[in-house]
Amino acid sequence: MFVNFKYFSFFIRTKMDGVTGGGTNIGEAVTAPPPRNPHPATLLNANSLPPPFLSKTYDMVEDPATDAIVSWSPTNNSFIVWDPPEFSRDLLPKYFKHNNFSSFVRQLNTYGFRKVDPDRWEFANEGFLRGQKHLLKKISRRKSVQGHGSSSSNPQSQQLSQGQGSMAALSSCVEVGKFGLEEEVEQLKRDKNVLMQELVKLRQQQQTTDNKLQVLVKHLQVMEQRQQQIMSFLAKAVQNPTFLSQFIQKQTDSNMHVTEANKKRRLREDSTAATESNSHSHSLEASDGQIVKYQPLRNDSMMWNMMKTDDKYPFLDGFSSPNQVSGVTLQEVLPITSGQSQAYASVPSGQPLSYLPSTSTSLPDTIMPETSQIPQLTRESINDFPTENFMDTEKNVPEAFISPSPFLDGGSVPIQLEGIPEDPEIDELMSNFEFLEEYMPESPVFGDATTLENNNNNNNNNNNNNNNNNNNNTNGRHMDKLIEELGLLTSETEH
């Protein structure tokens, strides 16, 4: 390779002259001009203007047209983003040329804004106040620490500066994201509390439902037991033919006892006489399985009629006098079944007829004979008692008797007796009737023998028209014999 030494030597000589300062032109060309200082007025104008981000944010919040999306708070020291989605879609592109709400929040964080309320997007800064826009120039941007002077000379310092810058950027990012994380944590806590309340409520409802199910199961068990009892009862009734009849017998007897108890409370009601006679007719089931008709007792109805007329006979007050020696208490007799007759039970002489209502009079007390001296009377022996009236006001009453006119209505005792059938035991009663002569007291009830005979004959004629001929003849013979005996007793008493 051939080199031109002429040019090479010239180049070396020129270079040496520039280093030693021998040439002025070359030295002037090599020396760089000094830097220019900025004008003081330009620096003042640059420091008096607020950052563009703060100015745009202030104008956006101050605009009344955007109050539905972003507006000042009631205290006018902060602003609130009411609708972040619409804020990102409409306002951010208009003022900041992007639509990222997170970038807007990070930018606020770099200028020192803080989130006031965790439940909403409310930001505040000491220099960001409503109506005081000139305070925006006091808000400064946070600077990241970076070493530019010694970065080329010291690699370690350069790495340190880069690490510090990354830490500053990381801290700023953490500070910006802190608001969102805290808000999310608070929201999650509130949601957790709501879920816990709902869980407690659901557990209470479950416990209540379990209790109701247990009660329902108990009710079902009781219903099953009752159903089994009903089925066993029906099976027993079907298998045992006498079971149902016995059950009906028991119910009928219970109803009869209730009816008999009600009879005693209706003795003084005149209007219920016919109802009482019909209420005693019950269908009873006999022991042999046949249905028989229960008939009311003749002596019971006769006694009821006498008790109804007790107010018309004041002379009966002597029977309830405390000076009486003895008396008789009438008891109800059980119904006769299967053709068997039951006798009346004799009552001790100490039991008077005190249950008969009476009024006090001045008549002397009448002594009743002891029941032990009277032969036991059967029900059949009393059934053929005559139905005549024993008083006749048309006859003259002997002086030995008290006139019954003050005690009677119309001169007769209103005793109503039903038709009494014939009883074969009346003959035995008539044969033993003579013992009454020594115990028969003087009483104004029966009058003289003539009156009794006339009344008995009239009533016997009426009975003959209604009854059969055979029964009437038999009753007539019995009544004639009874009248004859009563007449003899009365005549002996008068003499």
Swiss-Prot record:
Family matches, as Pfam families: HSF_DNA-bind
Motif AHA in this chain: 433-442
Lineage of the organism: Eukaryota, Viridiplantae, Streptophyta, Embryophyta, Tracheophyta
Name this protein carries in UniProt: Heat stress transcription factor A-1a
Localization (cell): Cytoplasm; Nucleus
PANTHER family named in the record: HEAT SHOCK TRANSCRIPTION FACTOR (PTHR10015), HEAT STRESS TRANSCRIPTION FACTOR A-1A (PTHR10015:SF447)
Induction notes from the record: By heat stress.
Biased composition (Polar residues): 272-281
Quaternary structure note: Homotrimer. Interacts with HSP70-1 and HSP70-4. Binds to CRK1. Binds to HSBP.
Keywords (A to Z) from UniProt: Activator, Cytoplasm, DNA-binding, Nucleus, Phosphoprotein, Stress response, Transcription, Transcription regulation
Keyword field contains Cytoplasm: yes
Annotated spans, Hydrophobic repeat HR-A/B: 172-238
Originating species: Arabidopsis thaliana
DNA-binding region: 50-144
Motif (Nuclear export signal): 482-489
One Gene Ontology molecular-function label: sequence-specific DNA binding
